[in-house]
Amino acid sequence: MSYQKKQPTPQPPVDCVKTSGGGGGGGGSGGGGCGFFGGGGSGGGSSGSGCGYSGGGGYSGGGCGGGSSGGGGGGGIGGCGGGSGGSVKYSGGGGSSGGGSGCFSSGGGGSGCFSSGGGGSSGGGSGCFSSGGGGSSGGGSGCFSSGGGGFSGQAVQCQSYGGVSSGGSSGGGSGCFSSGGGGGSVCGYSGGGSGCGGGSSGGSGSGYVSSQQVTQTSCAPQPSYGGGSSGGGGSGGSGCFSSGGGGGSSGCGGGSSGIGSGCIISGGGSVCGGGSSGGGGGGSSVGGSGSGKGVPICHQTQQKQAPTWPSK
C-alpha cells in the first residue's frame, strides 16, 4: 500500500503594491507641497500644508496628506480633503482644502502632517500634532507623529507619548514633536532611534534627521518614520518629514522659508528636495512636478513544497 503525501498547491507570491510614481508638486497658493511617502502623488493645499500620508494605511490624501495612522484610509479630518480609504494604495489627487490643513488637524492654516493623535494644530503651516498632545501653533512645525496606531505592519516610530509635543514651536520651525515653544525646539521625538535634529528657529529649518530602516512586516508601502525631521521652514513653512527606508532624510533639507511647503521624502527616494520658498512647493517640486518614483515595498512569501514520501 503506497502512501504519498499530497503536495500543497503553490500559491503565487503576495502582490507587491507599487506606489504610484511622480507626485510631488505642491499646488495651491503658498505651496502645500507634500510629497507622498513611497512616491505617491502630492498636491499641496494653500497656505502651505506640508504633509504626507501615514504609512500603513494606504491612501493618498494628496496635498493634505492627512494620512490616517494604521490601516484604513479615510480622508483626514479637519479640512483634509483627499484620501480615499484603501488598504495599501495611494490615490493620487486629494489635496487639502482651505488652508491645507493636515489630516486630523482641527486648526486653521496649513497643518502639516498626519498624526493619529488628537490635538489639532493651529496657525499657519504647523507640522504635526503628536498624539495626545496639543498641536503646534504658529509657524511651521516639523514632524509628523503617529499616535498609538502608527503605521500598519511596523513599529510606530516618531510617536509622542502623552503629548510630548506640548506646544510645538511658535514662530519659526520646530522639530518634530518639539516640546516647548520658541524657535525650533529640539524634537522630543521618542521611539525609533534617530531623533530629529532640532528645528531651526526662524529662517529655514535645516535639521533633518537620519532616517531609520524599519523591518517590513507587511506588503503595504511603509515609510518608516525613523526619524522625524525637525526642520520646519521659516515663517509659515512646515518642516519636512523624512521617512526611513530608502530615501533616508536626504532632500528634506529644511523646509522652505515663506508660507510654505515642507517636503517629505519617501521611503523609496526623495520626493521633494528641500521644499521651495513661497508658492509651489514641496514634493519634488520644482515647478510642482514630482520626480519621486514609487517603489514596490512588500514581502514575497517564499513557497516551500512538502517532501514527497516514497512509495512503499
From Swiss-Prot:
Any Pfam family hit: Loricrin
Keywords: Cytoplasm, Disulfide bond, Ichthyosis, Isopeptide bond, Keratinization, Nucleus, Palmoplantar keratoderma, Repeat
Per UniProt, location of the Isoglutamyl lysine isopeptide (Lys-Gln) (interchain with Q-216) cross-link in this chain: 89
Cross-link position per record: Isoglutamyl lysine isopeptide (Lys-Gln) (interchain with Q-212): 312
Residue intervals passing through the bilayer: none
Listed Gly residues bias regions: 276-293
Protein name, as recorded: Loricrin
Stretch list, region Disordered: 1-27, 276-312
Crosslink feature (Isoglutamyl lysine isopeptide (Gln-Lys) (interchain with K-89)) location: 154, 216
A GO BP entry: keratinocyte differentiation
Cross-link Isoglutamyl lysine isopeptide (Gln-Lys) (interchain with K-312): where in chain: 212-213
Species name: Homo sapiens (Human)
Cross-link (Isoglutamyl lysine isopeptide (Lys-Gln) (interchain with Q-213)) at residue(s): 312
Entry annotated with the keyword Phosphoprotein: no
Main location class: cytoplasm
A single Gene Ontology CC term: nucleoplasm
Function: Major keratinocyte cell envelope protein.
Disease tied to this entry: Vohwinkel syndrome with ichthyosis: A variant form of Vohwinkel syndrome without hearing loss and associated with ichthyosiform dermatosis. Clinical features include palmoplantar keratoderma, pseudoainhum and ichthyosis. Compact hyperkeratosis with round retained nuclei and hypergranulosis is observed on skin biopsies.
PTM section of the record: Substrate of transglutaminases. Some glutamines and lysines are cross-linked to other loricrin molecules and to SPRRs proteins. Contains inter- or intramolecular disulfide-bonds.
InterPro entries, per the entry: Loricrin
Subcellular location: Cytoplasm; Nucleus, Nucleoplasm
Compositionally biased tracts (Polar residues): 299-312
